[in-house]
């Protein structure tokens, strides 16, 4: 006897079993879930996979998202601790990793994350050999290098979320100072995501008007308007949010969805993300730093040759040296 479903539906052709635009998020902590929700909110994938080692938390997050399916345009939301669930992903977002313990050195933290990534990355490649990996876990520049080494992928398919968020914070703070929407305030934060990032004051503009031409002291200690404080706030803002609420997640989630939109829709937008910079600006080691990069469906296809001043280049090189001093001592890569 025919079932209700058979009475209701007449099949014409078999359904496609391989997703067109699948995204995986590895790690369902605060950052991973903010990324997942931001990606769903922008309707960027037809299938979203979540992976974590915490099975109950993972299942709970999956069910919670599935219950909102009516309000989303994502056909399928799946989750499992087995990486088979990630098969055929176009982009894999890695947010997993261990947290820094009190008094722990960065090298020790990075080494512990290397050990985590040694399990994660080969599993990703096994099931999605053609994917692009977007690394979000901190310290992001070093872990992007680690991912590149462990994955064997070409460098254009291993990208760090880098200074996309730092630049967004910069443009927001600039917009507050000027009373103009952040999208009309143009400025770039490059280099290391975090403490040694570089503000490119020479390129800061509104409608093509260079702010440094209007205020030649901008970004220096001589500046009576103290614009240098804006960059200082960018660097300190994450620490402040962590102090207030315990972690940061929403802004990085929006930032990641923004990067995914550029790649999933093949937009060729220029965004400050972490890429391999050996051979650029006199940097001699294999380090990943943020530069203005063109992102497309192929990954990171080009780097914009930004005209940097001597002091900005010196800061970039200093960042590179800092990162290399940690990377060169990493084991098992």
UniProtKB/Swiss-Prot annotation:
**Active site positions, chain numbering:** 193 (proton acceptor)
Q: One Pfam family, short name please?
A: Ldh_1_N
Q: Which cellular compartments is it found in? A: Cytoplasm
Binding positions for NAD(+) per the UniProt entry? 29-57, 99, 138
What is this enzyme's catalytic activity, as reactions? (S)-lactate + NAD(+) = pyruvate + NADH + H(+)
Q: Which NCBIfam families match?
A: L-LDH-NAD, PRK00066.1
* Protein name, per record: L-lactate dehydrogenase B chain
Which lineage? Eukaryota, Metazoa, Chordata, Craniata, Vertebrata
